[in-house]
Protein backbone atom coordinates (compact mmCIF):
# COMPACT_ATOMS: atom_id res chain seq x y z
CA UNK A 1 0.00 0.00 0.00
CA UNK A 2 1.10 3.58 -0.58
CA UNK A 3 -0.43 4.82 2.66
CA UNK A 4 1.40 6.54 5.46
CA UNK A 5 0.15 6.45 9.01
CA UNK A 6 0.58 9.32 11.40
CA UNK A 7 -0.98 7.83 14.50
CA UNK A 8 -4.12 6.05 15.60
CA UNK A 9 -6.88 6.39 13.03
CA UNK A 10 -4.78 8.52 10.67
CA UNK A 11 -5.12 7.77 6.99
CA UNK A 12 -2.91 9.60 4.52
CA UNK A 13 -2.28 8.19 1.05
CA UNK A 14 -0.01 9.43 -1.72
CA UNK A 15 -0.18 8.39 -5.37
CA UNK A 16 2.28 5.52 -5.95
CA UNK A 17 5.38 6.52 -7.91
CA UNK A 18 4.46 4.25 -10.84
CA UNK A 19 1.31 6.35 -11.41
CA UNK A 20 3.08 9.73 -11.25
CA UNK A 21 4.28 9.72 -14.89
CA UNK A 22 1.84 12.31 -16.32
CA UNK A 23 2.66 14.91 -13.64
CA UNK A 24 4.78 17.92 -14.66
CA UNK A 25 6.83 18.19 -11.45
CA UNK A 26 8.64 16.10 -8.85
CA UNK A 27 8.23 16.21 -5.05
CA UNK A 28 4.76 14.65 -5.29
CA UNK A 29 2.88 14.98 -2.01
CA UNK A 30 5.08 17.81 -0.72
CA UNK A 31 2.16 20.23 -0.39
CA UNK A 32 1.12 18.15 2.63
CA UNK A 33 4.53 18.44 4.30
CA UNK A 34 6.44 21.16 6.09
CA UNK A 35 9.09 21.12 3.35
CA UNK A 36 7.91 22.77 0.14
CA UNK A 37 10.40 22.38 -2.72
CA UNK A 38 12.84 25.16 -3.63
CA UNK A 39 12.48 26.99 -6.95
CA UNK A 40 8.71 27.37 -6.67
CA UNK A 41 6.41 30.12 -5.43
CA UNK A 42 4.90 29.04 -2.10
CA UNK A 43 1.39 29.86 -0.91
CA UNK A 44 -0.10 28.99 2.46
CA UNK A 45 -3.35 30.26 3.94
CA UNK A 46 -5.34 28.93 6.88
CA UNK A 47 -8.78 30.41 7.45
CA UNK A 48 -11.74 29.62 9.70
CA UNK A 49 -14.61 28.58 7.43
CA UNK A 50 -17.10 27.41 10.08
CA UNK A 51 -17.54 28.12 13.79
CA UNK A 52 -19.15 24.67 14.21
CA UNK A 53 -16.63 21.82 14.74
CA UNK A 54 -19.41 19.37 13.76
CA UNK A 55 -19.41 20.82 10.20
CA UNK A 56 -16.23 18.90 9.27
CA UNK A 57 -18.08 15.92 7.76
CA UNK A 58 -20.49 18.04 5.72
CA UNK A 59 -17.76 20.39 4.48
CA UNK A 60 -15.48 17.43 3.79
CA UNK A 61 -18.15 15.83 1.61
CA UNK A 62 -18.47 19.10 -0.33
CA UNK A 63 -14.70 19.41 -0.75
CA UNK A 64 -14.30 15.79 -1.87
CA UNK A 65 -17.03 16.16 -4.53
CA UNK A 66 -15.49 19.29 -6.13
CA UNK A 67 -18.27 21.59 -4.82
CA UNK A 68 -15.83 24.24 -3.55
CA UNK A 69 -14.04 24.32 -6.90
CA UNK A 70 -17.33 24.38 -8.84
CA UNK A 71 -18.28 27.64 -7.11
CA UNK A 72 -15.12 29.25 -8.56
CA UNK A 73 -14.40 27.48 -11.85
CA UNK A 74 -15.93 25.27 -14.51
CA UNK A 75 -15.11 21.75 -13.30
CA UNK A 76 -14.85 18.66 -15.50
CA UNK A 77 -13.93 15.72 -13.29
CA UNK A 78 -13.55 12.00 -13.84
CA UNK A 79 -15.57 11.50 -10.64
CA UNK A 80 -15.22 12.40 -6.99
CA UNK A 81 -11.86 13.09 -5.40
CA UNK A 82 -9.79 9.90 -5.13
CA UNK A 83 -6.17 9.01 -5.77
CA UNK A 84 -5.41 9.23 -9.48
CA UNK A 85 -8.66 10.94 -10.46
CA UNK A 86 -8.32 13.86 -12.87
CA UNK A 87 -10.01 17.22 -13.12
CA UNK A 88 -9.97 20.02 -15.69
CA UNK A 89 -10.55 23.46 -14.18
CA UNK A 90 -11.53 26.31 -16.49
CA UNK A 91 -11.78 29.92 -15.34
CA UNK A 92 -14.82 31.46 -17.04
CA UNK A 93 -12.92 34.77 -17.44
CA UNK A 94 -10.09 33.04 -19.35
CA UNK A 95 -11.63 31.09 -22.24
CA UNK A 96 -9.29 28.54 -23.72
CA UNK A 97 -7.33 28.09 -20.49
CA UNK A 98 -7.61 24.63 -18.96
CA UNK A 99 -5.87 23.78 -15.72
CA UNK A 100 -5.65 19.99 -15.77
CA UNK A 101 -4.74 18.21 -12.52
CA UNK A 102 -4.50 14.75 -10.99
CA UNK A 103 -5.29 13.95 -7.36
CA UNK A 104 -1.96 12.89 -5.84
CA UNK A 105 -2.84 12.59 -2.14
CA UNK A 106 -5.92 12.07 -0.01
CA UNK A 107 -6.24 12.77 3.72
CA UNK A 108 -9.02 10.92 5.57
CA UNK A 109 -8.58 11.31 9.32
CA UNK A 110 -11.04 11.86 12.17
CA UNK A 111 -10.05 15.54 12.56
CA UNK A 112 -8.75 16.30 9.03
CA UNK A 113 -9.97 15.65 5.52
CA UNK A 114 -8.85 16.81 2.11
CA UNK A 115 -6.59 16.22 -0.82
CA UNK A 116 -3.78 17.52 -2.98
CA UNK A 117 -3.66 17.68 -6.74
CA UNK A 118 -0.75 18.07 -9.08
CA UNK A 119 -0.45 19.64 -12.49
CA UNK A 120 -0.67 17.79 -15.79
CA UNK A 121 0.72 18.89 -19.17
CA UNK A 122 -2.17 21.21 -20.11
CA UNK A 123 -1.88 23.26 -16.90
CA UNK A 124 -0.24 26.70 -17.35
CA UNK A 125 1.70 26.18 -14.09
CA UNK A 126 3.57 23.21 -12.71
CA UNK A 127 3.28 22.25 -9.08
CA UNK A 128 0.85 21.05 -6.47
CA UNK A 129 -1.92 22.40 -4.27
CA UNK A 130 -3.44 20.91 -1.11
CA UNK A 131 -6.86 21.65 0.38
CA UNK A 132 -7.24 20.44 3.96
CA UNK A 133 -10.18 20.94 6.31
CA UNK A 134 -9.29 20.59 9.98
CA UNK A 135 -11.56 20.47 13.02
CA UNK A 136 -10.55 22.44 16.12
CA UNK A 137 -12.29 23.60 19.29
CA UNK A 138 -13.39 26.81 17.54
CA UNK A 139 -14.69 25.27 14.32
CA UNK A 140 -13.33 24.11 10.97
CA UNK A 141 -10.32 25.67 9.25
CA UNK A 142 -9.45 25.39 5.56
CA UNK A 143 -5.74 25.28 4.80
CA UNK A 144 -4.55 25.80 1.24
CA UNK A 145 -0.89 25.10 0.57
CA UNK A 146 0.66 25.29 -2.87
CA UNK A 147 3.95 25.38 -4.68
CA UNK A 148 4.03 26.39 -8.33
CA UNK A 149 6.01 27.97 -11.12
CA UNK A 150 5.14 28.82 -14.72
CA UNK A 151 4.96 25.85 -17.09
CA UNK A 152 3.81 27.39 -20.38
CA UNK A 153 5.28 30.33 -22.28
CA UNK A 154 2.19 32.44 -21.60
CA UNK A 155 2.41 31.69 -17.87
CA UNK A 156 6.11 32.67 -17.87
CA UNK A 157 5.30 35.94 -19.63
CA UNK A 158 2.40 36.74 -17.29
CA UNK A 159 4.72 37.27 -14.29
CA UNK A 160 2.91 39.20 -11.54
CA UNK A 161 -0.44 38.72 -13.31
CA UNK A 162 -0.12 34.95 -12.93
CA UNK A 163 0.64 35.33 -9.23
CA UNK A 164 -2.37 37.65 -8.84
CA UNK A 165 -4.60 35.03 -10.50
CA UNK A 166 -3.41 32.38 -8.02
CA UNK A 167 -4.03 34.74 -5.08
CA UNK A 168 -7.49 35.54 -6.47
CA UNK A 169 -8.49 31.86 -6.68
CA UNK A 170 -7.08 31.08 -3.23
CA UNK A 171 -9.38 33.78 -1.78
CA UNK A 172 -12.31 32.53 -3.85
CA UNK A 173 -11.84 28.97 -2.56
CA UNK A 174 -11.97 30.22 1.05
CA UNK A 175 -15.06 32.32 0.29
CA UNK A 176 -16.73 29.38 -1.46
CA UNK A 177 -16.15 27.08 1.51
CA UNK A 178 -17.59 29.72 3.86
CA UNK A 179 -20.70 29.93 1.66
CA UNK A 180 -21.05 26.13 1.66
CA UNK A 181 -20.71 26.24 5.45
CA UNK A 182 -23.45 28.86 5.73
CA UNK A 183 -25.76 26.60 3.72
Language-model features: locations:
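Hydrophobic-ligand binding "helix-grip"
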Residues: 93-137
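Short, intrinsically disordered, mixed-charge
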Residues: 60-68, 122, 138, 175, ...
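Hydrophobic ligand-binding cavity/cleft-lining segments
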Residues: 3-94
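Beta-strand/loop substructures that line and gate deep hydrophobic ligand-binding cavities in soluble
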Residues: 119-164
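Hydrophobic side chains in beta-strands
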Residues: 47-49, 89, 105, 133-135, ...
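A conserved amphipathic terminal alpha-helix motif
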Residues: 11-19, 149-183
Amino acid sequence: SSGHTAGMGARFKVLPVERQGPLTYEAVGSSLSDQLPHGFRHVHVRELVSSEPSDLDRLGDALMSWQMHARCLKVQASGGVELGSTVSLRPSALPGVAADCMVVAVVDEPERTGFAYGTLARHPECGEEAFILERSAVGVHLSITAFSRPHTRIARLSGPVGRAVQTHFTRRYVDAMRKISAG
